[in-house]
A protein has these predicted regions:
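The canonical Cys-X-X-Cys-His
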Residues: 87-93, 151, 187-197, 249
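Electrostatic cytochrome c docking/interface patches
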Residues: 62-83, 96-101, 157-183
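Axial heme c-ligation environment in periplasmic c-type cytochrome domains
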Residues: 98-106, 120-166, 201-207, 225-257
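Sequence context surrounding c-type heme c attachment/ligation sites in exported
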Residues: 80-88, 114, 179-191, 203-218
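N-terminal secretory signal peptides that target proteins for export/translocation
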Residues: 1-40
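Bacterial N-terminal signal peptides
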Residues: 44-56
């Protein structure tokens, strides 16, 4: 008999989990497999669609810059085409993501955005990307250097619609960590690199202000776990922080302006 249809025998009076769940209990594994397959198909479809959209975006780097071996200046109009055709589904066309699962990109420093896109790409000699995200790896791999400059410049030029702090119970702890660090753990003040208002420093440290607390917290956890490994400095800092400290400072950052 097919193993999928076999059911364990139960003595009279014993608890039968299949009976408790009803006649659809045997369908649960199949439903789970179908749901997972649908997610894989959706992600693959998004990457294919992104590649097709990118193929229609003209690469208009100046011939003079190419001949001189210089990177062409960013083209914000071309970047907008990429953002609308490729990035909008998760981050919104203007970079103000509607979901806390996806970061807000609006007003982020162009150099930081470009670095992250490059970090999502596989490295030389078959080494894995420095940032591990299957969806972003597919998108980033479809972008050439000029397109990365273009879309990064476009998002940097957009106006941020900031998120907000939500947890009043943790605001004092979050403020203390952001402005003064955690001396006993060797955690420096966030403001030292990201500026007192969270605006960051162009070409050095990213803008944090107004970012979703959920996203910021998830990245601190990723640095601590080593699943995000493109900043040794942040990996060291995150390794010294507790879950509560991460949550507190992330929520405080969301309220910075």
């Amino acid at each position: 008999m097919n193993s999928f249809m076999q059911m364990p025998a139960f003595r009279k009076g014993s608890h039968n989990p299949h009976r408790a769940l009803g006649p659809f209990s045997l369908c649960v594994p199949l439903v789970t497999r179908l749901r997972n397959a649908a997610l894989v198909l959706r992600n693959a479809t998004m990457v294919i669609a992104a590649s097709l959209a990118l193929a229609m975006v003209p690469n208009i780097a100046s011939a003079q810059d190419k001949a001189a071996g210089k990177p062409a200046k960013p083209d914000i109009a071309a970047g907008q085409q990429i953002a609308s055709g490729v990035c909008a589904g998760c981050h919104a066309a203007d970079g103000n993501s509607p979901s806390p699962a996806n970061p807000k990109l609006a007003a982020q420093h162009a150099a930081y955005l470009a670095k992250q896109l490059h970090n999502f790409k596989p490295q030389a000699e078959g080494k894995p990307p420095e940032r591990n995200n299957a969806i972003m790896q597919g998108f980033a791999s479809a972008l050439n250097d000029q397109q990365i400059r273009d879309v990064s410049a476009y998002f940097a030029a957009q106006k941020l619609k900031p998120a907000a702090a939500k947890n009043k119970d943790l605001v004092e702890l979050g403020q203390k960590i952001y402005r003064g660090g955690i001396a006993e753990k060797g955690v420096p003040a966030c403001a030292g690199c990201h500026s007192p208002n969270g605006a960051g420093i162009p070409d050095q440290y990213p803008r944090l202000q107004g970012q979703y607390a959920e996203y910021t917290e998830s990245q601190l956890v990723a640095f601590r776990q080593g699943t995000r490994a493109n900043s040794s400095q942040m990996m060291t800092i995150a390794a010294r922080m507790s879950d509560k400290e991460m949550k507190a400072v992330s929520d405080y950052i969301a309220g910075l302006r």
